[in-house]
C-alpha cells in the first residue's frame, strides 16, 4: 500500500484511467465486431459506414495511447481487405 500522498493519488488516477481505457477498447471491439457481422451478412450499403466507424475508433485509441499504432494499422488493413473483397464480389 502506498504511504506517500502523491502515490495514493496516483493509485486513484490509474484506476480511473484504466476504466476509461477499458471503455475505449470495448467500444472499439464492438465496432469491429459489428463490421465483421455486416461483412458476413453481405450488406454492401452499411459496410462502408461500419468500416469508417471502426477505423475512427481504432485511430482514437491510438491517439489516446490505448493501443499501439502498428496494431491499429494491422487491424485496419485486414478489415479493409475484407471490405474490398465484399465490394468486388
From Swiss-Prot:
One of its GO terms (biological process) is translation. It comes from the Bacteria. Keywords: Ribonucleoprotein, Ribosomal protein, RNA-binding, rRNA-binding. InterPro entries: Ribosomal_bS20, Ribosomal_bS20_sf. SUPFAM superfamilies: Ribosomal protein S20. GO terms for cellular component: cytosol; small ribosomal subunit. One of its GO terms (molecular function) is structural constituent of ribosome. Signal peptide: none annotated. It holds the Pfam family Ribosomal_S20p. The keyword Protein transport does not apply. Belongs to the bacterial ribosomal protein bS20 family. Binds directly to 16S ribosomal RNA. This is Small ribosomal subunit protein bS20. It comes from Wolbachia sp. subsp. Drosophila simulans (strain wRi). The gene is rpsT.
Amino acid at each position: 500500500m502506498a504511504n506517500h500522498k502523491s502515490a495514493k493519488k496516483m493509485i486513484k488516477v490509474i484506476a480511473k484511467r484504466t476504466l476509461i481505457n477499458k471503455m475505449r477498447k470495448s467500444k472499439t471491439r464492438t465496432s469491429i465486431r459489428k463490421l465483421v457481422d455486416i461483412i458476413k451478412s453481405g450488406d454492401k450499403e452499411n459496410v462502408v459506414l461500419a468500416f469508417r466507424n471502426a477505423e475512427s475508433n481504432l485511430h482514437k485509441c491510438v491517439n489516446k495511447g490505448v493501443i499501439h499504432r502498428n496494431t491499429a494499422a494491422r487491424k485496419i488493413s485486414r478489415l479493409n481487405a475484407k471490405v474490398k473483397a465484399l465490394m468486388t464480389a
